[in-house]
Amino acid sequence: MKKNFYTISKTMSRSLKLILFSVFIGFSIFLIPQPTWAYPFWAQQKFENPREATGKIVCANCHVASMPTRAEVPQAVAADSVFKTVVEIPYKKDLQEIGADGSKVPLQVGAVVMLPDGFKLAPQERWTDEIKEETQGVYFTQYSEEQENIILVGPLPGDQNREIVFPVLSPDPRKDSNYNFGKYSIHVGGNRGRGQVYPTGEKSNNNLFTATNSGTITSIETNEDGTQIINLNNEEGESFTENLPAGTSLLIKEGDTIEKGAKLTEDPNVGGFGQLDKEIVLQSKARVIGMIIFFIGVGLSQIMLVLKKKQVEKVQAAEGI
């Protein structure tokens, strides 16, 4: 009974936090407009795990464009140690994109690091001075209360954060039998710029738009908010309209005859998402010491064999064999 009550209370607490956070974000959108904001909480609300069975990280569902992401991870780490996972999100300097309101804005970046079970964000009291300096202005969040091993960062200004340092604490299998020494996979995702699709499935203005009908363009209307309406008639005299969001750059003009599927705008996207997998070994000190002793033993055995062989050769030479 107590266990059920605890589970229900925990679920209600998590739901309440999510609702309050969503309300806060909703007010923020109106009070503090940020045209290039990316919201990791959309993924947190829709997916229990940000990595699909196919291996794709769900950020790619909205950030359709692909761009490279790199990561630096130690080959091996000791138990209960702090190490750095560095995510590199490269793009050209001073690059700008169109915001949701159609204006030109700097790119922002974000990253996700999916660690093996037991690995988590290192507590700040264990950060070195170097790590503290490298993570200034960076705010880390875990994907959910139950998933300490999935760490999110962003959105952050891209110009100052093309490299994001994640301080990670490794587990200690000697103290917790749920974890084992061995080789593990780390999944990393990095993004720069806005997505091409909203979580609702609608296309953002960060897209190439094509004609949904054929015909001749009779007029192009521009509204106060920057959105545009393309009016056209086909050969049968039917009228159609193409609605374009703010910030798009037209490739067509009045009087042009276009076919269905023809490009209406330039492709404004300059960003993209990339992901990769890395491997890390959780090393046992006892095993390392054992290996060293083993190799020393093998080396000494080889030396003894060589010395013994030379001794035998000397005896044989003395006896004239």
Curated annotation (Swiss-Prot):
Database matches in InterPro entries: Cyt-f_TM, Cyt_f, Cyt_f_lg_dom, Cyt_f_lg_dom_sf, Rudment_hybrid_motif
State the disulfide connectivity.
none
> Which Gene3D superfamilies does the protein's record reference?
2.40.50.100, Cytochrome f large domain (2.60.40.830), Single helix bin (1.20.5.700)
* Main subcellular location: membrane
From the record, give the transmembrane residue ranges.
Answer: 288-308
Gene Ontology cellular component list: plasma membrane-derived thylakoid membrane
Cofactor binding notes: Binds 1 heme group covalently.
A Gene Ontology BP annotation from the UniProt entry: photosynthesis
Provide this UniProt record's keywords sorted from A to Z. Electron transport, Heme, Iron, Membrane, Metal-binding, Photosynthesis, Signal, Thylakoid, Transmembrane, Transmembrane helix, Transport
Molecular function (Gene Ontology), one example: iron ion binding
Q: Which cofactor does it need?
A: heme
Signal peptide position in this chain? 1-38
State where the protein is found.
Cellular thylakoid membrane
Q: What's its membrane topology?
A: Single-pass membrane protein
Q: Which residues bind heme?
A: 39, 59, 62-63
Q: Could you tell me the superkingdom of the organism this chain comes from?
A: Bacteria
Cite the NCBIfam families for this sequence.
PRK02693.1
Q: What does this protein do?
A: Component of the cytochrome b6-f complex, which mediates electron transfer between photosystem II (PSII) and photosystem I (PSI), cyclic electron flow around PSI, and state transitions.
Q: Which family is it part of?
A: Belongs to the cytochrome f family.
Question: What does the record note on quaternary structure?
Answer: The 4 large subunits of the cytochrome b6-f complex are cytochrome b6, subunit IV (17 kDa polypeptide, PetD), cytochrome f and the Rieske protein, while the 4 small subunits are PetG, PetL, PetM and PetN. The complex functions as a dimer.
Protein name per Swiss-Prot or TrEMBL: Cytochrome f
| Species name | Prochlorococcus marinus (strain NATL1A)
What gene name does this entry carry?
petA
